[in-house]
Amino acid sequence: MSFSPLIRQLIDALRTLPGVGQKTAQRMALQLLERDRSGGTRLAQALSQAMTGVGHCRQCRTLTEEELCPQCADPRRDDTLLCVVEGPMDVYAVEQTGYRGRYFVLKGHLSPLDGLGPEAIGIPQLVARIEEQGTFTEVILATNPTVEGEATAHYIAQLLTNKGLITSRIAHGVPLGGELELVDGGTLAHSFAGRKPIAL
């Protein structure tokens, strides 16, 4: 089926969303045009406002429309803890755990094949933030448990070796409530390597 230029433009725009392929984009576009034009208009307005009004927090680099995000603006947070994550969605995930320290958001992970070195993801800014703040005693490396995430965490830990900080890595392994037979070998190996004694 061939679509008019405006419909094709809408479909192509919707395909830029993660996980949205050709068929899904077509369904979304036709749904908005045929059944929910007011919803489509609200979506367009919200998207336009977000694209022009949302930037990055000057301290942690997460997404916000203010100079400081809510976490950086909160004086009750623990200034001795700094959690390093790969992206803004990770901040929201860590917040669900009750973590009350500060954040630094990288722009992804090290990936030399994709041209993403330390400068591209903001590691020099991370080091500068640690040195300028001067209150951190522990840096928690909460990068994803992928090869690239592990390499990024290792690189940062090496950089911070002589800074007088505790550098820790979030644990990962068998999920709570998971069954061993369903866990992949790499995850299980990590779980065995990171095993801890049972405190009685």
Curated annotation (Swiss-Prot):
ZnF region ranges: C4-type: 57-72
Gene3D superfamilies named among the record's database cross-references: 3.40.1360.10, 6.10.250.240, RecR Domain 1 (1.10.8.420)
Keyword Metal-binding found: yes
SMART domains: TOPRIM
Pfam families assigned: RecR_C, RecR_HhH, RecR_ZnF, Toprim_4
UniProt KW Cell inner membrane keyword: no
PROSITE patterns reported in the protein's UniProt record: RECR (PS01300), TOPRIM (PS50880)
UniProt GO MF annotations: DNA binding; zinc ion binding
Single GO BP term: DNA repair
Residue ranges of every copy of the Toprim domain listed in the record: 80-175
Disulfide-bonded cysteines: none
Alphabetized InterPro entries for the sequence: DNA_Rcmb_RecR, Rcmb_RecR, Rcmb_RecR_Znf, TOPRIM_dom, TOPRIM_RecR
Keyword field: DNA damage, DNA recombination, DNA repair, Metal-binding, Zinc, Zinc-finger
The protein's role, per its UniProt record: May play a role in DNA repair. It seems to be involved in an RecBC-independent recombinational process of DNA repair. It may act with RecF and RecO.
Similarity comment: Belongs to the RecR family.
NCBIfam families: recR
Designated name of the protein: Recombination protein RecR
Organism name: Pseudomonas fluorescens (strain SBW25)
Gene symbol of the encoding locus: recR
